[in-house]
Design a protein with these regions (language model features):
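Binding/recognition "hotspot" determinant
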Residues: 1-68
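Alpha-helical transmembrane segments and their helix-start/interface "positive-inside/aromatic belt" motifs
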Residues: 3-21, 92-108, 213-220
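Non-cytosolic segments of integral membrane proteins
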Residues: 10, 14, 21-25, 104-196, ...
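Hydrophobic transmembrane alpha-helix segments characteristic of membrane transport
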Residues: 68-104, 196-210
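Alpha-helical transmembrane segments
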Residues: 201-218, 239-243
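Transmembrane helix-bundle signature of multi-pass membrane transporters/permeases
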Residues: 216-224, 255, 259
Length: 262
């Protein structure tokens, strides 16, 4: 009898600990996860970030980029003189000057270009979420997803981590917690690649460095378009029947959460 009471007490303690932990995770996640995932122009509306980037060509990283622009010009001038001496074929002066002017202007407008590109990307993901909102009658967001998943699992007072519903609740909470780290890293990486935008554009002036722009562009596109993919996955998840008695719905929701983590 004492062993039975001890076992029950241990189980209740474990359930209480995990219930408190998962409840804390849930109340923390929904307030930040949407902001981290669905990036908009607010990511650039930071005075410190603007100073680091450089609102004009006279401050921030744009100063370094413009200095490198002068460096590319000197490098080409030396190559041109050397080519005349060694009778080598290099890029014609008017071609280089044309590229220098075009990419120099684009480079100094890179902050504006990034701002507009982020707004377009945000518009696409918001459009997908708006379609879902019109269909299902509620927001397509992580905060709404957490509310639905809490309904899908079980009531807090009945939480039992050793039950099927308890395992589902545990998996969902831990997965969403992992999403915070993944999308926080993505948020930081987007900022990093925005900061190096002037240097990526500058690399197009010389054919030997143009690979840097291609790598930068592929990475930026994959980072930004990820939020449209997340919006589509959320749309699919919300199409499921959220019922605690429907095991298939529970498994499909777990599959959707797993897809978000991956």
């Amino acid at each position: 009898m004492e062993n039975s009471n001890l076992t029950t007490s241990i189980i209740e303690t474990i359930n209480s600990i995990f219930e408190t932990l998962f409840s804390s995770i849930d109340t923390t996640i929904y307030s930040v996860l949407d902001e981290l995932t669905f990036i908009d122009k607010n990511i650039l509306n930071n005075s410190i970030f603007q100073k680091i980037f450089g609102s004009t060509g006279n401050n921030g990283l744009l100063v370094i980029a413009n200095s490198l622009l002068v460096g590319f010009s000197l490098y080409y001038a030396i190559r041109l003189i050397y080519s005349y001496y060694m009778n080598l074929q290099i890029e014609r002066p008017y071609q280089f000057i044309f590229k220098l002017l075009i990419f120099g202007i684009v480079m100094n407008c890179s902050y504006f270009i990034c701002n507009q590109f982020i707004q377009i990307n945000s518009f696409i993901s918001d459009a997908i979420r708006t379609v879902g909102s019109n269909i299902f009658g509620h927001d397509i967001s992580f905060s709404e997803l957490i509310n639905k998943l809490n309904y899908l699992s079980i009531k807090e007072k009945e939480f039992n981590i050793f039950s099927f519903d308890g395992l589902i609740k545990s998996f969902i909470s831990i997965s969403l917690f992992n999403l915070i780290f993944s999308y926080s890293l993505r948020y930081i990486m987007v900022k990093v690649f925005i900061l190096i935008t002037p240097f990526a554009i500058l690399s197009l002036i010389n054919e030997s460095t143009s690979w840097f722009f291609k790598t930068w562009l592929k990475t930026v596109l994959s980072l930004l378009f990820q939020q449209s993919l997340v919006a589509i996955i959320l749309l699919i998840i919300f199409s499921f029947n959220f019922s605690s008695n429907n095991i298939i719905s529970q498994l499909m929701c777990i599959g959707g959460i797993y897809a978000l983590v991956r």
